């Protein structure tokens, strides 16, 4: 996605450092870091045979030989098989997607909540593409998301030109989403040239055999079905070079690739990001237009991808007079699509709920919205916090509102002041039967106990 800033990435033991401009998608989380370890701590680490190296600049303890969540370049994915995956057993989600209460049985708690408006959260759930444990670590400091009731789909954000472009969600995140009735999908990320992108990666990805099959598409399907997650988000932003340019043929192949995936595995979701157009150009539309609609519907009106995540500039003053969310809704209806298959993107990675948003452009004026809503990097609540208490308070304001109560009417100083996601998204629940059982844990803690004894921090979503 087109980004304004660069954030520093964490690096992990024995993993290549990502190229500095991998900004764009998996910028590292650098909050809540502790002080330098004491001598006593160093002795404990030595006794436990943990290794801390210069590469691990956050001093995060990484256990030797721990299983690792997967990530690949296209050519590596083609070589992957479940039978030869050493960490297969650890990377499989074991929780089926829970059924949610039917939206028609939900009751709005304010006059602007809409049962049809959906929310897609694109979130950095782990701090980097590589080095992620599938199920927890001995640390309490982590992005423990707790507002699943406002999310309809979670994109597990990852990928970098220095580590891998194809990133399935870690199974702990998939399990947590599924418990709450939220589909979780992985990321396919082709970075811009300035961030290390190579057109050869896209060519390998889109290669079609003479029999009409797409080998990488088959592997994406196999990975999702084997690991137990729900689909893929495709972000293609590699521009190519004068010698090897991006072309209309790439756009056509991408459409065919997505249609092939949906034909082979209709149950898997495919989301396309508003980037490459039908002309084979990087031209962010910030709306559903004639230039990018081919990735939602072909010329005969047949469906392609399930949804589209629009770029973020529709809310900027220079484009405000075009009323792009409204125009997108009209274009969707013209194509025979639901306008709620289109997600107006909001980039809050840098400033969170301090980000100015033209909500008046998003609202339809009928206690509804023109499109659905896409939130890029709601993990800001975690990365900007100095401690877990601040994290939870920021997350509450971000997802609910400044009064921490979705039923409260709030008078805003301007149309651009943060409204809170609960302003538009109705609360959804996966609790459809009794008994209801919970341990009241968010998934992290300062103590882990076994036989009533324990002194180790833990994170286990």
Language-model regions, residue ranges each:
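Ser/Thr/Pro-rich, acidic low-complexity intrinsically disordered regulatory segments
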Residues: 50-102, 234, 391-441, 458
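Bacterial signal peptide processing site
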Residues: 33-35
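Chitinase-like catalytic core of GlcNAc-active glycosidases
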Residues: 111-327
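Bacterial Sec-dependent N-terminal signal peptides
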Residues: 2-16, 20
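Substrate-binding and catalytic surfaces of secreted/luminal carbohydrate-active proteins
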Residues: 269-272, 288-291, 299-461
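C-terminal motif of bacterial Sec signal peptides marking the signal peptidase cleavage site
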Residues: 28-31
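N-terminal module-boundary/linker segments of secreted carbohydrate-active enzymes
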Residues: 40-148, 268-269, 278
């Amino acid at each position: 996605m087109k980004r304004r800033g660069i954030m520093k990435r964490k690096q992990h033991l024995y993993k290549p450092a990502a190229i500095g401009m991998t900004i764009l998608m998996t910028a590292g989380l650098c909050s809540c870091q502790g002080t330098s370890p004491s001598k006593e701590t160093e002795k404990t680490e030595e006794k436990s045979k943990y290794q801390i190296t210069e590469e691990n600049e956050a001093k995060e303890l990484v256990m030797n030989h721990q299983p690792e969540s997967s990530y690949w370049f296209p050519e590596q994915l083609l070589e992957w098989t479940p039978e030869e995956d050493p960490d297969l057993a650890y990377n499989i989600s074991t929780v089926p997607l829970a059924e949610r209460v039917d939206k028609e049985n939900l009751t709005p708690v304010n006059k602007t909540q809409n049962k049809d408006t959906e929310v897609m959260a694109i979130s950095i759930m782990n701090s980097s593409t590589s080095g992620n444990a599938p199920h927890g670590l001995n640390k309490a400091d982590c992005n423990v998301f707790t507002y699943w009731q406002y999310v309809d789909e979670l994109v597990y954000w990852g990928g970098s030109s220095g580590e891998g472009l194809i990133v399935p969600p870690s199974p702990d995140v998939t399990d947590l989403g599924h418990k709450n009735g939220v589909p979780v999908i992985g990321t396919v990320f082709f970075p811009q040239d300035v961030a290390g992108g190579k057109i050869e990666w896209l060519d390998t990805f889109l290669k079609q055999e003479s029999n009409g099959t797409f080998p990488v598409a088959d592997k994406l399907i196999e990975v999702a079905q084997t690991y137990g997650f729900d689909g893929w988000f495709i972000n293609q932003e590699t521009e190519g070079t004068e010698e090897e340019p991006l072309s209309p043929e790439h756009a056509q192949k991408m459409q065919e690739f997505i249609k092939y995936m949906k034909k082979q595995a209709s149950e898997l979701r495919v989301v396309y990001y508003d980037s490459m157009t039908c002309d084979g150009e990087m031209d962010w539309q910030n709306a559903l237009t004639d230039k990018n609609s081919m990735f939602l519907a072909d010329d005969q009106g047949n469906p392609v991808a399930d949804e589209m995540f629009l770029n973020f500039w529709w809310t900027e003053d220079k484009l405000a007079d075009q009323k792009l969310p409204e125009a997108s809704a009209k274009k969707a209806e013209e194509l025979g699509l639901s306008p709620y298959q289109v997600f107006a993107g909001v980039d809050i990675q840098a400033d969170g709920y301090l980000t100015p948003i033209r909500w008046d452009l998003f609202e339809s004026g009928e206690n509804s919205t023109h499109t659905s809503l896409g939130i890029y990097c709601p993990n800001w609540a975690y990365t900007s916090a100095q401690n877990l208490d601040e994290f939870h308070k920021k997350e509450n304001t971000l997802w609910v509102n400044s009064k921490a109560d979705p039923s409260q009417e709030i008078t805003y100083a301007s149309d651009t002041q943060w409204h809170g996601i609960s302003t538009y998204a109705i609360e959804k629940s996966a609790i459809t039967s009794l008994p209801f059982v919970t341990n009241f844990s968010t998934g992290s803690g300062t103590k882990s106990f076994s036989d009533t004894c324990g002194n180790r921090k833990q994170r286990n979503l």
